[in-house]
C-alpha cells in the first residue's frame, strides 16, 4: 500500500475514534463511527483476494447496521427528551436499542457472528487493529452510558459472550479464529462488571490490549496462522514460540499470569454485589478458554513433529525494527501480577 494512502487511512481511523471518545453529541459520535468504519475497510482488503473482500463486505454490512441502530436510538431519545446529549439517554427503548447497536459493533453475543469470519479472512496486522483499536470507540460509549443501560440485558450478553467465546474456540485450528473467540469472551467479562464498577472494565481493557498486541505481533514474526504451523516453528524459533504460548495462557487467564488479574478482580466485584451464582458460572465458563489454550500449548511444545531440519535453531534472527515495543508488551502481558501481586487488592 502507498505510504501516503496508508498514513491518510490511519489518520482518519484515529480521528474517528477520538471524535467518538471526546463527543457528547450523538450525531458527532455517529460521524466518528462512520469515519472509523470507512477507514479500516481498505486495511481489511490489503491482500486483494476474494476472502479479504468477503470479510470486508461482512464487516461493512454489520457495522452499517449497527450505525443505523445507533442513529435510530438517538432519534428516539431526541423525540422523548429533546436532547442529543449522551448523558440524557432517558428513554428505555432508546437505551436498549443503543446497547444492541454497541454490542453489534463490539461483537458481543448474540451479535458475534461476524467477528470470527472477518478476522479469519484478513491479514494478521489488520486482525490486530480490528480486535484492539476498533474496540475503543464502542467501549468508551458503553462507559459513558453505563448508569443508563439495562442490567439484565448486559448480564445476558456477558454470559452468552463468555460461553460462546469458550465453546467456539474448542475445535478451531486457525489461530485468527481462536483470537476472535477469545476477544468475544473478553468483551463478555468487561460487560459483566460494567454497571457495578466501570473502572474495572477499563482495567480489563488495558490488560487485554497488550496481551492481544503481543500475541498478534509474535504470530506476525513467525508468519503463523494455524496450530500446525505453530508446532513447526518450535524447531526454528523456540524462544519466540515459548513466549507466544505463555502469552496465550495469560489470555486464557491462567494464574499467576497477568490475564488472571482482571478475572480475579471482576469475580471479586460480582461477589461483593451478591452475584455469587453469576460469578461461579463465569468462572466455570472461563475454563473453556483456558482449555483450548492449554491444548495449543501441549500440541506445540510437547509433541514435536518429525522434521528433516538438522539445524534446530537459526543462527541469526532478523528482528523487525517496527516491533521495538515488543519487550515491554511481553512484560505487561505476562508479569504484572507475579511481579506486583499487591495490585490485586488495591481498591
UniProtKB/Swiss-Prot annotation:
Tell me which family the UniProt entry assigns to this protein.
Belongs to the complex I subunit 2 family.
First-listed, main subcellular location of the protein, grouped into a coarse class: mitochondrion
Any Pfam family hit: NADH_dehy_S2_C
Q: Which organism is it from?
A: Nyctophilus arnhemensis
Q: Which UniProt keywords apply?
A: Electron transport, Membrane, Mitochondrion, Mitochondrion inner membrane, NAD, Respiratory chain, Translocase, Transmembrane, Transmembrane helix, Transport, Ubiquinone
Q: What does this protein do?
A: Core subunit of the mitochondrial membrane respiratory chain NADH dehydrogenase (Complex I) which catalyzes electron transfer from NADH through the respiratory chain, using ubiquinone as an electron acceptor. Essential for the catalytic activity and assembly of complex I.
Q: Its Enzyme Commission number?
A: 7.1.1.2
Task: Report the protein name in the record.
Answer: NADH-ubiquinone oxidoreductase chain 2
- Where can this protein be found? Mitochondrion inner membrane
In alphabetical order, the GO MF annotations are:
NADH dehydrogenase (ubiquinone) activity
Its membrane topology is listed as: Multi-pass membrane protein
- Point out the coiled-coil segments of this chain: none
GO cellular component, alphabetical, reads:
mitochondrial inner membrane
Amino acid at each position: 500500500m502507498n505510504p501516503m494512502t496508508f498514513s491518510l487511512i490511519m489518520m482518519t481511523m484515529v480521528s474517528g475514534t477520538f471524535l467518538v471518545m471526546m463527543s457528547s453529541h450523538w450525531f458527532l459520535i455517529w460521524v466518528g463511527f462512520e469515519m472509523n468504519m470507512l477507514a479500516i475497510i481498505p486495511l481489511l482488503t490489503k491482500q486483494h483476494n476474494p476472502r479479504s473482500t468477503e470479510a470486508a463486505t461482512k464487516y461493512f454490512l454489520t457495522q452499517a447496521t449497527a450505525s443505523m441502530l445507533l442513529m435510530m436510538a438517538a432519534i428516539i431519545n431526541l423525540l422523548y427528551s429533546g436532547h442529543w446529549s449522551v448523558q440524557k439517554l432517558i428513554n428505555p427503548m432508546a437505551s436498549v436499542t443503543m446497547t444492541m447497536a454497541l454490542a453489534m459493533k463490539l461483537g458481543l453475543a448474540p451479535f458475534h457472528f461476524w467477528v470470527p469470519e472477518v478476522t479469519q479472512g484478513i491479514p494478521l496486522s489488520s486482525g490486530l487493529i480490528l480486535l484492539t483499536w476498533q474496540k475503543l470507540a464502542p467501549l468508551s460509549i458503553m462507559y459513558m452510558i453505563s448508569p443508563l443501560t439495562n442490567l439484565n440485558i448486559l448480564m445476558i450478553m456477558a454470559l452468552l459472550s463468555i460461553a460462546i467465546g469458550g465453546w467456539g474456540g474448542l475445535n478451531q485450528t486457525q489461530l485468527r479464529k481462536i483470537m476472535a473467540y477469545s476477544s468475544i469472551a473478553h468483551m463478555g467479562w468487561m460487560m459483566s462488571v460494567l454497571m457495578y464498577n466501570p473502572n474495572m472494565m477499563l482495567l480489563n481493557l488495558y490488560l487485554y490490549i497488550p496481551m492481544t498486541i503481543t500475541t498478534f505481533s509474535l504470530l506476525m514474526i513467525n508468519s503463523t496462522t494455524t496450530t500446525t504451523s505453530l508446532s513447526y516453528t518450535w524447531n526454528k524459533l523456540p524462544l519466540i514460540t515459548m513466549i507466544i504460548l505463555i502469552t496465550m495462557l495469560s489470555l486464557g487467564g491462567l494464574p499467576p499470569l497477568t490475564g488472571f488479574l482482571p478475572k480475579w478482580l471482576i469475580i471479586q466485584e460480582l461477589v461483593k454485589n451478591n452475584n455469587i451464582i453469576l460469578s461461579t458460572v463465569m468462572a466455570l465458563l472461563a475454563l473453556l478458554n483456558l482449555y483450548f489454550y492449554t491444548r495449543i500449548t501441549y500440541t506445540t511444545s510437547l509433541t514435536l513433529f518429525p522434521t528433516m531440519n538438522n539445524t534446530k535453531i537459526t543462527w541469526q534472527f532478523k528482528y523487525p525494527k517496527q516491533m521495538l515495543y515488543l519487550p515491554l508488551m511481553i512484560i505487561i502481558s505476562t508479569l504484572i501480577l507475579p511481579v506486583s501481586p499487591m495490585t490485586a487488592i488495591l481498591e
